[in-house]
Amino acid sequence: MLEKTYDSASVEPKIAKAWDEANAFRAGANAKPGAETFTIVIPPPNVTGSLHMGHALNNTLQDILVRFERMRGKDVLWQPGMDHAGIATQMVVERKLMENQLPGRREMGREAFVEKVWEWKAESGGLIFNQLKRLGASCDWSRERFTMDEGLSEAVLEVFVTLYKQNLIYKAKRLVNWDPKLQTAISDMEVEQIEVKGNLWHFRYPLEKGVTYEYPVAFDADGTPTEFETRDYIVVATTRPETMLGDTGVAVNPEDERYKGIVGKHVILPIVGRKIPIVADDYADPTAGTGAVKITPAHDFNDFEVGKRCGLRAINVMNIDGTISIKENEDFLEGLSHPAALHGAWDRLEGQDRFTARKIIVEIFEEAGLLDKIEPHKHVVPHGDRGGVPIEPRLTDQWWVDNKTLAQPAIASVREGRTNFVPKNWENTYFQWMENIQPWCISRQLWWGHQIPAWYGPDGQVFVEKTEEEALQAAIQHYIAHEGPWKAWVEEKLENFAPGEILTRDEDVLDTWFSSALWPFSTLGWPEQTPELARYYPTNVLVTGFDIIPFWVVRMMQMGLHFMKDDAGNPVEPFSTVYIHALVRDKNGQKMSKSKGNVIDPLELIDEYGADALRFTLAIMAAQGRDVKLDPARIAGYRNFGTKLWNATRFAEMNGVKRDPHFLAETASLTINRWILTELANTARDVTAALENFRFNDASGILYRFVWNQFCDWYLELLKPVFSGEDEEAKRESQACAAYVLEEIYKLLHPFMPFMTEELWAHTAGEGEERDDLLCLTDWPEPEFRDDAAAAEINWLIDLVSGIRSARAEMNVPPGATASLVVVGANTSTEARLDRHAAAIRRLARADEIRGGDVAPKGSAQIIVGEATVCLPLGNLVDLAAEQARLEKAIGKVDAEMERIDKKLSNEKFVANADPEVVAAERERKAELDVQLASLRTALTRVSEAG
């Protein structure tokens, strides 16, 4: 006998062990001969990571697809792996060294530090894989890959060297997001936009040689200037005074009448003494600030573009740690006359932290009478998400990928339908990014990662090869072939050769996303032409979140199309479908964050409710394009769904239900059995179609309704008289049919609730028997039995009883009270149905009499079923006066709440200023109250008529 309650804590490890021992998830498990492949590569979690709700949703959806296709007999590979997570991992290990009072990274040196990282990875990395197994992820764990393992490192070298030799990777000086704390370039994804309360400082920049102009200070009603003042300066507004040391221009809008007369003139930059031009550029907004913008090309992304358009110099005035560097800065000093009067200011600023320098610069402007005003100003400041400090746009030499060239085939692939996004609207995000794509900075100033395969000769000449030996050969050929100052030097070094004397390797490593971009084919063995690569590439679907479309999806498309070709040499997409899931938010629709204290830990949910309940909740809430609002109460509710199935299996077992391997749906004779078999076929068809179209919420919702409503609430309830009756043949058929339907339910539910269904599958094998296969390796249900007449008859019965029950509930009829039913307008077919199902109607609808009538009794509740009206006279069932008073009171309460909500929603300030989630919740509540009010008023009308 099945245990009384399902204990997820004991069942889940047992089932996981059974899967593991059976190699149930290996590539090709359960594949039929000649089966087509189905491949998914897991978005590789960081080696430092632990399971969060985003992982739980992402991997639940992948696992549903993988288990579904494996049961359909496809040759399935779900490829697992981890990302080396450059910055995150380096920070973790550095923190560990500090906690253990060991020498820091720089003290121990690069080689020793990298060894420490590998040691940490062996001891502590990969925790998330065990957590994914707890969730039930059915990856082929024997094929686990890591972005720093030997095979993937070979792929990275191959791609870098190839792209470099195709002029698609190059080194150049451009602006990057620079983290002064970590002292490395970081990607846009590692930048967090944080709103801060700051200031807008208005500085006066004096015009050169006493040049003046008339500046409007008063205007008439039409905006025409009526009063002017003569100025020998221009006012610029900035939130970052410390960058003014690197200003090389002032921009005004070419249509701005205030400044047209001084475009082309120059100002003398205070503190610095540099003469810089006033230029006309559309970037300057006449309505913002003073309309004049200081241009610092080396410290602002927009200014960098203005500088390129207007031919302005880019002068970097900061060190890599964000301190000021001017006194020995050749770029800064170029063209300056070094007046002694400025040296004092330079001394005050040299070496200061950028924010300290900000205060000093404001003081100097104020002392010189050049501080026009200070305005409080809320604005967004980009911060490094790891270092936690404001990032600094920094002009620096880095390695870049020519994204624009690589983007063209990837744009065409989606536009021509070879790769499709689901939901389709995400294609707009993809195109928007691709069509405005910028060069990709791929170098990072870290030690943990793929070191860039570039070596420099004594004159700075770069040699890019896979190995130092190959780079050395290229260098020798280069220097020996060219008559020049370095030829003799190289020849001399070769005579007494020592490694590292001729070439010096680039110290930078590659952006983590570089190796991740190769994930779909590098994990299958590329650049080797392995059997796995031939078999499982391209992959079928990528399941991922929308936030990494630009950083990962785009780059996998670019690299896949560039490096993977079919037999005819045509580019091959890495996946045919990209399924984009939404965010998991808290129950109020707020994004989860530690600062808000609303982070939900999936492992805690698994501990409390079981993995199946969490998985089913995520699936049923994963409507395309709609964020998941996760309330633990919902998980408790779907745990109850599992309990319902568990109890249904126990009930069936107690009533002699056991599998009959010889049962055939076509041989069922009872209408009730033919009905459930028809509904089973409909359910299997609809669930299959929903999963094929990535409608996870529809698939799980269909299963929920079939299992809870049709099978448990109706089928088993209607079978009770059969199980307790004298007709042994009907009993045997129903027992076999119920067992068959339960087995099909386990199969259909398995992708969503794998642990419980696997346990039930094993338990219901039969006394003393074992299943031939694990449930995860059985065939997906494809029942075809249909009996529309039987389905129509039982669904008619369900509609009738449900209608009566609803009317009784609405009218507050005591649960134990029995009532007469009067049926008006029934045809002969309905009359026959009423006769056949009279016993069930009496039992389930609490009816003591069913009779025909010509008209509906006054004041009766009326239920339309087909052509007939079933009437429930109320006079003898309820205290009409008390019920009328109850309903009027309830209507009053609902009216009052509706009035409160209407006042709120009609308040423009509330709608404009309240959180969108709060406004949406009020609107949802109003819609609920509308329905409730209509129901109460209908009930009141019935009571009034009955009285």
Curated annotation (Swiss-Prot):
Motif 'HIGH' region: positions: 45-55
GO molecular function annotations of the record: aminoacyl-tRNA deacylase activity; ATP binding; valine-tRNA ligase activity
The keyword Cell inner membrane is assigned to this record: no
Motif ('KMSKS' region): 591-595
Binding site for ATP: K594
Gene Ontology BP term (one): valyl-tRNA aminoacylation
EC number: 6.1.1.9
InterPro entries for this protein: aa-tRNA-synth_I_CS (IPR001412), aa-tRNA-synth_Ia (IPR002300), Anticodon_Ia_Val (IPR033705), M/V/L/I-tRNA-synth_anticd-bd (IPR013155), Rossmann-like_a/b/a_fold (IPR014729), tRNA-bd_arm (IPR010978), tRNAsynth_Ia_anticodon-bd (IPR009080), Val-tRNA_synth_C_sf (IPR037118)
Keyword Nucleotide-binding attributed: yes
GO CC list: cytosol
Coiled coil: 879-943
Keywords (A to Z) from UniProt: Aminoacyl-tRNA synthetase, ATP-binding, Coiled coil, Cytoplasm, Ligase, Nucleotide-binding, Protein biosynthesis
Catalytic reaction list: tRNA(Val) + L-valine + ATP = L-valyl-tRNA(Val) + AMP + diphosphate
Localisation per UniProt entry: Cytoplasm
HAMAP family for this protein: Val_tRNA_synth_type1
Record family assignment: Belongs to the class-I aminoacyl-tRNA synthetase family. ValS type 1 subfamily.
Subunit structure: Monomer.
Comment, domains: ValRS has two distinct active sites: one for aminoacylation and one for editing. The misactivated threonine is translocated from the active site to the editing site. The C-terminal coiled-coil domain is crucial for aminoacylation activity.
PANTHER family attached to this UniProt entry: VALINE--TRNA LIGASE, CHLOROPLASTIC_MITOCHONDRIAL 2, VALYL-TRNA SYNTHETASES
Function (record text): Catalyzes the attachment of valine to tRNA(Val). As ValRS can inadvertently accommodate and process structurally similar amino acids such as threonine, to avoid such errors, it has a 'posttransfer' editing activity that hydrolyzes mischarged Thr-tRNA(Val) in a tRNA-dependent manner.
Protein name per its UniProtKB record: Valine--tRNA ligase
Annotated organism of origin: Agrobacterium fabrum (strain C58 / ATCC 33970)
